């Protein structure tokens, strides 16, 4: 059960984190952790999410080496690729002509063919597309609060109802 997002807590001078802890304490599973330890676990979790030490399971070192080698080649040639341009394509026009409000001209014949000049080709069919927006549950990283951990958090200065 996710804590409700409410402006009422801010009006009462209560932080969202404290309101979430209170909500979980009242309506959630058996929470055996004081707010101080809850906040410390939350900040540790936040630091973990924001750290650059995250490694994905599908990380491929060969791909990273290939990408780094390409970026070094591009940097040494003095050419920068624009969006949608592959490494083998010549640069079309200078970047100094680009400014706010400048639109790219569509290639000749696109207007005649009835294609949208802002069309970006993909390899997905419409039925395969996934919306980019996050759901309500995932929209805020604070939804990963400490009670989402699989293990039950406890602290030494919170009254325990279970024999140790």
From Swiss-Prot:
Record's subcellular location: Cytoplasm
Tissue specificity note: Expressed in testis. Expressed in undifferentiated embryonic stem cells.
Chief localisation class: cytoplasm
Positions with biased composition (Low complexity): 84-95
Keywords: Cytoplasm, Differentiation, Meiosis, Spermatogenesis
Disulfide bond sites: none
Region annotation (Important for interaction with piRNA) ranges: 111-159
A GO biological-process term: male gonad development
Summary of subunit composition and partner proteins: Interacts with UBR2; does not lead to TEX19 degradation and stabilizes it. Interacts with piRNA-associated proteins DDX4, EDC4, MAEL, PIWIL1, PIWIL2, RANBP9 and TDRD6. Interacts with L1RE1.
Function: Required during spermatogenesis and placenta development, participating in the repression of retrotransposable elements and prevent their mobilization. Collaborates with the Piwi-interacting RNA (piRNA) pathway, which mediates the repression of transposable elements during meiosis by forming complexes composed of piRNAs and Piwi proteins. Interacts with Piwi proteins and directly binds piRNAs, a class of 24 to 30 nucleotide RNAs that are generated by a Dicer-independent mechanism and are primarily derived from transposons and other repeated sequence elements.
Name of the protein this chain belongs to: Testis-expressed protein 19
Gene responsible for this protein: TEX19
């Amino acid at each position: 059960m996710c804590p409700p997002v409410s402006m009422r807590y801010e009006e009462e001078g209560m932080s969202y984190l404290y309101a979430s802890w209170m909500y979980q304490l009242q309506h959630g599973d058996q929470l055996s952790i004081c707010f101080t330890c809850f906040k410390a676990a939350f900040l540790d979790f936040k630091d973990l999410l924001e750290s650059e030490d995250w490694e994905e399971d599908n990380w491929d070192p060969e791909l990273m080496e290939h990408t780094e080698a390409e970026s070094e080649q591009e940097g040494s040639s003095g050419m920068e690729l624009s969006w949608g341009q592959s490494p083998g394509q010549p640069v079309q026009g200078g970047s100094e002509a680009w400014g706010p409000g400048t639109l790219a001209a569509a290639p000749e014949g696109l207007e005649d063919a009835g294609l949208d000049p802002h069309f970006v080709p993909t390899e997905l069919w419409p039925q395969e597309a996934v919306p980019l927006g996050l759901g309500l549950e995932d929209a805020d990283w604070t939804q990963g609060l400490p009670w989402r951990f699989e293990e039950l958090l406890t602290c030494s200065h919170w009254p325990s109802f279970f024999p140790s």
